[in-house]
């Protein structure tokens, strides 16, 4: 394909672009780790170069949308394209407000305007109206990243997304798993692209065509319960001209490891606790107290715990903070497990957590959604007699055990977990060796796929510095002292 790409595309990405680049409506159903963000950026660039668009509105989940600004666009947008990229914020400061107004009021054909918005903003009148203003002022490409976020036709965000779709000539949806529970999930996603794709203007007529329903009584309430599906070959045929589906197993030229991250915002409660703890640590430094390695690590540990959603007090009690990290994890799992939710799960996932409290929270949340057989924990409290059985079940493709929740110190050595090609670091350990060893539980002999590593990161906290240090192969425990400790705090 003759185009001045900034980063060289893989074969499957070229295929996706050839099929889609000039189409008005298209779905990239590409498994996590196959590079759908790059495909979208290249597609956007091609449309801009041909004079088809002068703006793009990319809507993504809260933990993802700023990755486009800080990572995906700078890495993949071709060098010859001048862009003006602005990210939505509901409470902008003076500079942010000026940038937001500028991208609305002053579109230029010599600059590609890229507006990034979190999908949750579509639940608000303010966010939806601003998105509408952007689209009305541009020849635009409208994108929903992780499009299962608009699968519920009754949700306000979905209704607003569908209204916005009529204002953009070009529309794209991106997701690794277009079907998270049942084929009905496709209706709103496809309606966003073009209602004509499925040939059903009504959600209920679509549901009747592709589901088997039986009349069910619960007390005095009578409703039709979905017990199965039908005409799925027909549904696949309708989607085929408008979508590209690829799995990591289909991509022979992918690198062995792919790293990505999800941003997690601190709640107000966490911000308050974090600010107070940081001030205390800085006071220790400024007062000239002798900072031993143990003292430094204790302060970093407390700040990291707060960013993860809890704090172990000096009394030994654990204070729990309301936090967004577990919500972001569950969003990732919904995409990673593949089509069909608990019935047709195609993937297994390793989740590493540094703290007991994190492991308990993760286990309880996954158990509630997917059932007790779908998740197991492997950490200090796990009896030795159960550990080998957990590994064997996880490695068994027929076993219902899909989620391995472990601590890097306990489970990061000596065991094989190649049944998973998705690894999530809910909270990291400071030790570089433990990070390397835990990565290699999935990336070792027997692994047939590219392994995707996802770090959950609380922005502008020690959490962010920990991940950066580990990715740069820096052992935090032996290097963060003195002035560097102060830099980590500020």
Functional labels for PLM-detected ranges:
Residues 39, 52-75, 180-185, 354-356:
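Conserved Walker A/P-loop ATP-binding site and its immediately adjacent core
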Residues 1-29:
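Conserved pre-motif I regulatory segment
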Residues 64-93, 193-196, 369-372:
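Conserved helix-turn-beta segment of the N-terminal RecA-like "Helicase ATP-binding" lobe
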């Amino acid at each position: 394909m003759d185009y001045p790409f900034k980063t060289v595309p893989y074969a499957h990405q070229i295929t996706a672009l050839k099929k889609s680049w000039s189409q008005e409506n298209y779905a990239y159903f590409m498994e996590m780790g196959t590079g759908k963000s790059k495909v979208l950026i290249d597609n956007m660039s091609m449309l801009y170069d041909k004079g088809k668009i002068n703006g793009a509105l990319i809507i993504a989940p809260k933990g993802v949308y700023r990755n486009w600004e800080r990572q995906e666009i700078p890495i993949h947008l071709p060098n010859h394209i001048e862009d003006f990229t602005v990210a939505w914020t509901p409470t902008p400061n003076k500079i942010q407000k000026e940038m937001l107004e500028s991208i609305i009021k002053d579109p230029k054909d010599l600059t590609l305007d890229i507006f990034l918005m979190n999908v949750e903003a579509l639940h608000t009148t303010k966010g939806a109206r601003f998105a509408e203003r952007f689209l009305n002022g541009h020849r635009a490409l409208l994108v929903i990243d992780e499009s299962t976020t608009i699968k519920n036709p009754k949700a306000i965000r979905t209704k607003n997304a569908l209204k916005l779709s009529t204002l953009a000539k070009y529309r794209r949806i991106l997701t690794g798993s277009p079907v998270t529970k049942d084929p009905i999930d496709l209706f709103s996603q496809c309606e966003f692209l073009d209602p004509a794709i499925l040939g059903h203007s009504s959600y209920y007529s679509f549901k009747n065509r592709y589901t088997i329903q039986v009349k069910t009584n619960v007390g005095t309430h009578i409703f039709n319960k979905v017990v199965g599906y039908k005409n799925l070959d027909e549904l696949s045929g309708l989607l085929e001209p408008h979508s590209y589906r690829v799995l990591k197993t289909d991509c022979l030229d992918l690198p062995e490891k792919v790293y990505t991250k999800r941003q997690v915002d601190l709640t107000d409660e966490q911000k308050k606790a974090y600010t107070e703890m940081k001030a205390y640590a800085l006071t220790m430094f400024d007062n000239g107290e002798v900072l031993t390695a143990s003292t430094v690590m204790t302060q970093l540990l407390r700040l990291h715990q707060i960013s993860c959603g809890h704090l172990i007090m000096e009394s030994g009690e654990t204070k729990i903070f309301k936090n967004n990290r577990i919500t972001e994890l569950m969003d990732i799992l919904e995409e990673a497990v593949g089509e069909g939710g608990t019935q047709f799960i195609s993937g297994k996932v390793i989740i590493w957590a540094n703290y007991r409290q994190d492991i308990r929270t993760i286990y309880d949340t996954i158990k509630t959604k997917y059932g007790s057989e779908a998740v197991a924990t492997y950490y200090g409290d796990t009896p030795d007699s159960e550990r080998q059985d957990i590994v064997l079940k996880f490695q068994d493709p027929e076993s219902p055990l899909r989620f391995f929740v472990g601590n890097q110190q306990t489970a990061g050595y000596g065991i094989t977990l190649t049944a998973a090609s998705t690894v999530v670091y809910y909270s990291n350990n400071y030790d570089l060796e433990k990070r390397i060893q835990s990565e290699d539980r999935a990336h070792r002999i027997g692994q047939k796929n590219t392994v995707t590593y996802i770090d959950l990161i609380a922005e502008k906290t020690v959490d962010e510095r920990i991940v950066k240090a580990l990715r740069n192969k820096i052992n935090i425990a032996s290097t963060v002292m003195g002035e560097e400790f102060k830099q980590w705090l500020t």
